[in-house]
Amino acid sequence: MRALLEMLEELRESSNKPIVMINKEDPLHFDKFMPIMKFADHIFTTDEDMIDGYRQNTDALSVTAMPFAANMALTNPVNRVREQTEDLCFAGSYYSEGHDERKRQMGYMLEPIVEFKGAIFDRMSVHDNPRYHFPERFRPFVRPAVDFRQMTQLYRRFKVFLNVNTIVTSPTMMSRRVYELLASGTPVVSSPSRAIEAHFDGIVPTASTARQACDAVDRLLNDDRHWWKTSQKGIREVALKHQYANRGNLVRKVVFDQDSAETQPLATIVLSTKRSQFFERIVKNISQQTYPRIEVIFAFHDSWPEERIAELENRLKQVSNIQRVRVLRFPGTASLGTKLNAAIAEAKGEFIAKFDDDDWYFPNYLQDMILTFDFSGADLAGKWSFPVWLEGSDRLVLRNPGNEHRLGSPYVAGATFVARKSWLQKIPFADRSQGEDTDVLKRSLAAGGKIYSADHFNFINYRAADVRHHTWRAESDLFERTGRAVGRRDDFQDWVV
């Protein structure tokens, strides 16, 4: 400690650069680290309740709350559904002495481990000390500790994790594991805390009794739609707000007064159509997107009436997050591939999202698709698992279940293509009107590209009763044979999150 304090004293006297310190162990080690924190020009703390204490005990220029976050390069949902899964897990340590509040919580929060025959990874298993031994009823479920890399794999292997809170009153301090699990697509059931409720309300269910904990776990394990929706909400919340890039932006803003780089890149929706009967669906699909920065480029068949085009432009330009609308006109002889390439060349966005005119794209579709590039390492993303509505039979069928969050997918639906513009300039569409999507996929793979099949939410494919409506004229019974029936038209909301 003395050597560190002497080094900080010398650094403060010899350098004009700000000293930034982060105490990630607040509030437990507030007093322990105070002699060090007094040298900081800017202090960041995991517990907002400690801000006044730092202001009273240091001369820091600023004191700011900064919660934990997730490194989505390590903790993410990639390929989670392609691994054999177990049901329920708790990872951590037990203290038979001290930590009375934590011990009380564990007394009821671990009951689901017994009821659902889960697993406990004991962080203190290497210490043969009775102080750290789990109570007798939980010991049959205890497994040895694993290192962090192994734990990140386990995050994806279990359907549900349990969490307890050593700190319950802080509005910002909670286990880092909660962020990492949600980033991995794994729902968490937790004992109550102010931080959990402030940051993950509606995402992390909390329990105050053993029965509540068992009921919350039971619903996640046995209600498939509830599990998937909870998983997707957690991924989105962490990817948008709780990555270390977000925390880095906060540090730059506080220390250097630099505006954060949190503005998301411009995304260009390209849509080629000759069917003006889908006018209202096109407007709704695009205008309801929650992604904050959108450009729209249409490639229209020259049969579209001028007044309809003018109305379309006018309505979309009134949407606050749509920054530019551009219309390109083409003769009937132009191929679909040619029109798409022209729209992409005109695009100013970093990302290109290909929309079809007759499918449904729900509000968080574009936001979630672009977030996948934060962690997937993909060159092109889309959906291989998605619901299709068969108009003739009013059936909703989930196509290709089990291919969600799949990196290395050989296929994604053309109507769901999202890629950086640079990739689609490297692998442009062929001059054809059928099979142009599959051709891009094949050439992408041949060029060493990585294709990511994302979640199955917020997009529903439309199959008309008359197959002549589609360029791919597969009969409806093909979809029913190769997919899984999941409802009817009234069940669309099950696939929107």
Go through the PLM ranges and name each one:
Residues N249-N285:
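N-proximal low-complexity "stem/linker" segments adjacent to membrane-targeting elements
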Residues Q232, I427-V497:
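C-terminal catalytic/acceptor-binding lobe
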Residues N364-R395:
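Conserved donor NDP-sugar-binding/catalytic core segment of glycosyltransferases
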